[in-house]
């Protein structure tokens, strides 16, 4: 039945995601990777939560004799198909191993702040040529703009500098486009960019939203990341199909009532 579910995905890319070295013994990973190749062929994406909290690192050092990232890199062949989620407590030498292998880091700034995990050295990683994607980690607040703001502001707090992830063209446009493209690559999807042949995933901003009044071009995207939120999106298209129109999702009222019913039932229990 599981394989039928996989087949039902159609053209949606499939991957392998052992949760973490806390949940999956590191010496089992080569067998899992081979099973993935047998099922999916070559080139599928692999995701794993790693070095998210200091206690995880300490326990891995005790049980494996090495940190989670080093244990992973010593056991499997890291490459561009691997996506290391969080990697909060990465060392400088581990950053070098990740970038040399071409592996990707996926950080979840709002969740990591909520849990008090720590701060990933994003600006250092990007300076080394590392590729950074953004995930939500199923946090209770799903907002891509807030994730990017938390990413940039955490670096500012850590380094006591401004514009840590900005380029000479600004902050917002670079952050949005680079993480969108990296996120698409982390899922082996032809998305995250506007070009012929790519998925038509498009966000149309509300130019009348207060944070976007006045700024134009790249400055508008700077304003979005520093002062805006998901509420500043007017229309959203996924694969060319409009999902949000004028800030409203199709069937939003019904979904709201269903959500309230489910939450009410959980709280009453």
Label for each model-derived stretch:
Residues 74-78, 123-209:
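His/Asp/Glu-enriched, well-ordered alpha-helical/loop segment
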Residues 52-103, 113-124, 138-145:
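Catalytic core of soluble alpha/beta enzymes
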Residues 84-86, 107-110, 134-136, 239, ...:
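Thr-Gly-centered strand-to-loop micro-motif
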Residues 174-269:
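Active-site microenvironment of metallo-dependent hydrolases
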Residues 22-23, 87-91, 111, 189:
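Short beta->alpha connector loops
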Residues 33-43, 77-80, 97-106, 127-132, ...:
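Glycine-enriched alpha-helix->loop->beta-strand junction motifs that scaffold or abut catalytic
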Residues 16, 49, 84, 98, ...:
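Divalent metal-coordination and catalytic microenvironments
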Residues 1-87:
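Metal-coordinating catalytic core of metallo-dependent amide/deamination hydrolases
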């Amino acid at each position: 039945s599981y394989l039928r579910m996989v087949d039902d995905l159609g053209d949606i890319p499939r991957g392998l995601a052992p949760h973490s070295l806390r949940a999956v013994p590191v010496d089992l990973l080569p067998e899992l990777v081979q099973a993935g190749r047998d099922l999916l062929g070559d080139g599928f994406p692999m995701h794993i939560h790693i070095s998210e909290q200091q206690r995880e690192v300490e326990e891995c050092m005790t049980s494996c004799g090495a940190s989670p990232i080093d244990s992973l890199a010593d056991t499997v062949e890291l490459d561009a198909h691997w996506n290391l989620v969080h990697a909060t407590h990465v060392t400088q030498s581990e950053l070098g191993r990740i970038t040399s292998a071409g592996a990707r880091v996926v950080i979840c700034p709002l969740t990591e702040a909520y849990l008090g995990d720590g701060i990933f050295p994003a600006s250092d990683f990007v300076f080394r040529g590392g590729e950074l994607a953004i995930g939500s980690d199923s946090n209770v607040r799903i907002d891509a703009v807030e994730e990017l703001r938390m990413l940039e502001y955490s670096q500012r707090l850590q380094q006591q500098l401004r514009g840590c992830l900005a380029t000479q063209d600004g902050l917002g446009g670079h952050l949005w486009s680079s993480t969108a493209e990296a996120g698409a690559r982390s899922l082996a999807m032809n998305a995250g960019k506007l070009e012929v042949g790519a998925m038509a995933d498009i966000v149309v901003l509300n130019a009348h939203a207060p944070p976007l009044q006045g700024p134009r071009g790249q400055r508008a995207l700077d304003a979005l990341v520093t002062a805006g939120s998901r509420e500043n999106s007017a229309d959203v298209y996924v694969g060319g199909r409009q999902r949000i129109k004028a800030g409203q999702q199709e069937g939003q009222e019904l979904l709201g009532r269903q959500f309230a019913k489910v939450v009410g039932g959980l709280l009453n229990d």
